[in-house]
């Protein structure tokens, strides 16, 4: 990247090696985000994704032709309604629905996997339409989500909840911490692979059906990272992460870096924005 001059940058030239983990550090206001977000990210979004974005001033960006994909793992919410949750975002709900649709009780009742979708009218709670909550508009105050009186937050109707796997309904599964779900689905490889990835990024304490609008920025970011890891990588993807270690314990930071290294080992490139060297174990990255 040549001649980056956005905001307080002054004709900055920088080279990021492909196929490695790169880290950009500096105190607040030093220009990290100007360099990587305003210039690099937006320029690549415009060139690779045809997005209409305002790009920070620069002369030229070379070498991006060798990349096939751009993924920005930021702290923006995964959604603003109870339908957006770890199970739906990582798509682990799909094989879980497959499994419930194959249970003997489901077959006896003529249910298919569709019955276990939030969007299936025949299977969901009719009062809250599968959200488990109702939105109360407060007009001059922030709107409030309150638990559905009819399903008590369980999302599905009584007939759907008659189907169980190892004694657990699909509502029980969504109300289950990821670590517990790993134990429940230990015999189901498709489901287990995604759940273990969520554990690896330090989200084992989170419930599978936890509403996306209750997640912190850091949790949303790690959830997005887990979703990427659970997909089969084709390599040649650039990942940009803005301060992913914020609020993490040192053990969680080490775990996160190992996960990022896995992406790099698959032929991808990572660029991380960090405030300080002390927040990262930099021997795993490219100085």
Model-derived features: positions:
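Conserved phosphate-binding elements of NTP-dependent enzyme cores
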Residues: 1-280, 285
């Amino acid at each position: 990247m040549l001649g980056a001059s956005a905001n307080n940058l002054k004709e900055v030239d920088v080279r990021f090696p492909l196929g490695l983990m790169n880290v950009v550090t500096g105190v607040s206001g030093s220009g990290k985000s100007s360099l990587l977000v305003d210039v690099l990210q937006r320029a690549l979004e415009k060139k690779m994704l045809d997005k209409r974005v305002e790009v920070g001033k620069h002369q030229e960006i070379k070498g991006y032709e060798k990349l096939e994909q751009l993924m920005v793992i930021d702290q923006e919410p995964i959604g603003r309604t109870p339908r957006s949750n770890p199970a739906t975002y990582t798509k682990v709900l799909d094989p879980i629905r497959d499994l419930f649709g194959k249970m003997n009780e489901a077959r006896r009742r003529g249910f298919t996997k569709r019955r276990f979708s939030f969007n299936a009218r025949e299977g969901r709670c009719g009062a809250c339409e599968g959200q488990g909550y109702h939105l109360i508009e407060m007009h001059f105050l922030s709107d409030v989500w309150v638990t559905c009186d009819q399903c008590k937050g369980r999302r599905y109707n009584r007939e759907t909840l008659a189907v169980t796997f190892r004694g657990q309904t699909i509502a029980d599964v969504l109300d289950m911490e990821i670590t517990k779900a790993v134990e429940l689905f230990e015999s189901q490889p498709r489901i287990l692979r995604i759940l273990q990835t969520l554990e690896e990024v330090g989200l084992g304490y989170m419930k599978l059906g936890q509403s996306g609008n209750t997640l912190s920025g850091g949790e949303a970011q790690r959830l997005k990272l887990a979703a990427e890891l659970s997909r089969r990588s084709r390599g040649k993807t650039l990942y940009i992460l803005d301060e992913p270690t914020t609020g993490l314990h040192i053990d969680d930071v080490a775990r996160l870096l190992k996960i990022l290294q896995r992406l790099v080992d698959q032929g991808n490139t990572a660029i991380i924005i960090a405030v300080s060297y002390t927040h990262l174990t930099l021997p795993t990255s490219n100085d």
